[in-house]
Amino acid sequence: MKHALWAIAVLSTASLVACSENLDSDHSSPVLDRDQQIHKPGGEPSAPGHDNKDDDKPGTGGVDRPGTGGDDKPGTGGSEGDSTITVNPTPDADKDKDKDDEKPGIGDGDKDDDKDPIDPIDPTPSLPDKDPTKADDAAIDYGTKTVDGVDYPIQSMTNAPYTTLQRRHKPTIGSAQYSAGDVVKLIANGDLKVTQKKDYKLYGLGTSYTQGKPWNVKSDLLRWGDPGLKRKGKSLAYFWQVSDPQIIDAQSPCRMEAVVRSPYVVSSAYRAQGIYSTHMFDMHVQTARRISDHSSRPFDFALVTGDIADNAQTNEFDWFDRMMSGGVVEPDSGKRDDPIAGPNNDFTDPYYARGLGNIPWYIAIGNHDNLYMGFTPIQDAHREACIGDTVVDLFDSFPVASAPFREGYNNGFQDASDPDSPVRGPGTKTAADARRMPLTKIEALQKFYNAGGIPQGHGLDLDTIAQGWGYYATYPIEGKPIKLITLDTNSGKFSEADMAPVQNAWLKNQLDIAKDRHELVILQSHHGTSGFNGEVTAQGFHQLVASYENVIVHITGHGHSNSSTIRTSKDHGYWEVMLASVVDFPSQSRIFEIVYEGDGIIDIYLTNIEPNAPRGSFVDTAVQYAAARRFFGGFKGITETDPAKRAIIILENAEAESEHMNLVLRTRVPKDVYENLEKYKWSNVIESETLLNKLKFEESK
């Protein structure tokens, strides 16, 4: 009966599945040499130069949120002068690039060929004695880390860091044997299935490299006159954002891996790259940390905009925690064995994650962090199925299930005992594992609160968690007038965004406080705001936030693609920016830098990074699998019937998304805000210009 109830719960939301976002384009912290300032429940976080005595205002609905007062890094507040890294002039290579790089990637698919104890975080291994701004595919082997007498490998990286300013992946389709049109036709007819990953290369499904994307400068919000981008000023904040890693326990019996293709479900829950989801996220963490280490000052903080888990499972949260904090990651569940003998040769093998280091991070909870597969509330039937030993038929005891649904929409998991990790469907027996227990929203928020790293709680507060909410306000850079407001946009029912009136009232109070204090405001949430359709509508939300001229940007995830939008009210506006996911192509995270030019002008640099993984690695394979998946679920909204033309449209759509990848978003703030900013000491080094824009990538000889 429980299985029947589960099936009803799932099928009642079948129109939402499309794997949620894809339709939208207790352990202690390790010992760290950094002071922590933790604000106890009961008050607004202290702002620079302010006490809190008069800040409590009516209308908050009793949900006043404390925050964490940020943890300043040594030297981040006042480092001045030149970057400590010697860099070469910006290359003119783009002018001489082969024009073929700009063509869709057709036919070039084959061109590139119980918790373990947490150790204190290691320093970054030394790089080879060569220009640290030049990277190629020659990998740095970081060797192993010994924990409790066991040697665990650390993932290799390219020999120096790079960003998508230098190079990026592009999807490919077609090979010497099969044209792009042939491949699209095979997919459309069901003769080539998304689960046939061993055949991807044969059909040219994967990636090749193309030149990087320069910053797209957008000055739309400069309301009077544009003096042009100065590329200098004061660096107010330098931080990293990562979103939607959707860490997957690919062996869980309650996954919907047996969804192949159906007219009712546009895209499958199956991801070929899902078996490497921990490796993908760990490589993003490593890449971000290495860039931070190479900068003249480290990142001030990091933002994690939700969906860290795919199925809200306990072990998925634990793997995320380990990769952020540092320690041994074993992406295995059920029977803990070594199906392919030897270390570091299958996706279940344990490895050592170096973690984010001493960079504080702040969380915004996502729908996949608290809902079954991201779109329906966790019920007892889900829990029973996830920790059980049998793959449950989604339609068991559900007589009204129609044949079309049954054909392409069911449960299953990827079998690690086979090198091709085929999907095993309903009825398959597997080892039970209590660590797969799905978490409710409150349990998920508690997991985030107790996660390792800094600051304690990662912005969250236990009193607010107890009420089922994950919103808060904090000052991520201690002693500086920059306020971070984190919203909880989860409806708790489906994958869509929602904004409860009580939270909206709390937000208005926080914005009033920031306005009175002349502070710069950054918002973050998992969802973008266009989907707000409850009591608080998208239009109402935009009008509220845009009426505060000190709000400069709202940072989101969820949609698995890059976008930038102006939100306005009367004569003022702010930027809302969405970041692509880690788990799906193009698998990117993002570096932000907020720069004050002077005269009230703010420049927000956005630079996307891909995982700096060498060719042939698990992560490189995963990115190629992710690119291939676009062709199995990428036909939504495409009316073109010619297969070859349809392939080109999918490639062109991917290229169009890249226009929102690297950006400089410009805006103005009112006089009281910039005069307040000018009272503080800031770094003169614009890391985006002095480091990120000067990196180079060279192919290995």
Language model features with spans:
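Bacterial N-terminal signal peptides that target proteins for export
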Residues: 1-7
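Bacterial Sec-dependent N-terminal signal peptides
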Residues: 9, 15-58, 80-103, 111-126
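Active-site neighborhood of phospho(di)ester-bond hydrolases with catalytic His/Asp-centered motifs
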Residues: 241-243, 300-307, 357, 362-366, ...
